[in-house]
Amino acid sequence: MSRPVSPFWPLEWWLAWWEAWGPEPYVAPLREADQARTLARLHATAFARPWDAHEFERMLCERATQGHALWRAGAMQGFILSRKVADEAEILTVVLAPSARGGGLSHRLLREHLGHLALIGVAQVHLEVDEGNAPALKLYARHGFIRVGTRTGYYAQADGSRATALTMRADLT
């Protein structure tokens, strides 16, 4: 039995194409280990000690890893990775391409990721953030994260110095 063809199929096809490739950003699950090189390139734009493609490939193959990517016009603009254990998760990294920063896209990415974590039974989320990263601190506070501790000398800086990390937690229930 064949399915009837809508008289609007050209429009429906165009709208589906536009949604996938148009300028409107969207968030989608990140599951493909073959995206590891793209993740490594984006990560290198944000961190003094970036992770390599093999590290990302290994993480994406782990069952405990949860990830989402932010896409716009067919290109990955950012991503977030977490590791889930029982009813808790740790955000491992959040990255936006330099061209995507400052427009509220990190809020959208984090909101959708936290919503997904809540749906799969995560009650509490933890993370570490550089104490000097004011935009990230503002973003996390907006999403209910509170400071619970510090780790002195945790992050390596480009100049060889070490920066303090703030440990933060948010309850999703």
What are these regions, as identified by a protein language model?
Residues 128, 146-162:
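Conserved catalytic-core motifs of GNAT/GCN5-like acyltransferases
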Residues 86, 104, 108, 131, ...:
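Residues at secondary-structure transition points
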Residues 2-8, 65, 124, 130, ...:
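Conserved catalytic core of the tyrosine transesterase superfamily
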Residues 8, 13-103, 107-120, 169-173:
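Acetyl-CoA-dependent GNAT
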Residues 97-111, 118-120, 124-125, 130-138, ...:
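Conserved glycine-rich acetyl-CoA-binding loop
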Residues 58, 132, 155:
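Positions that flank functional sites
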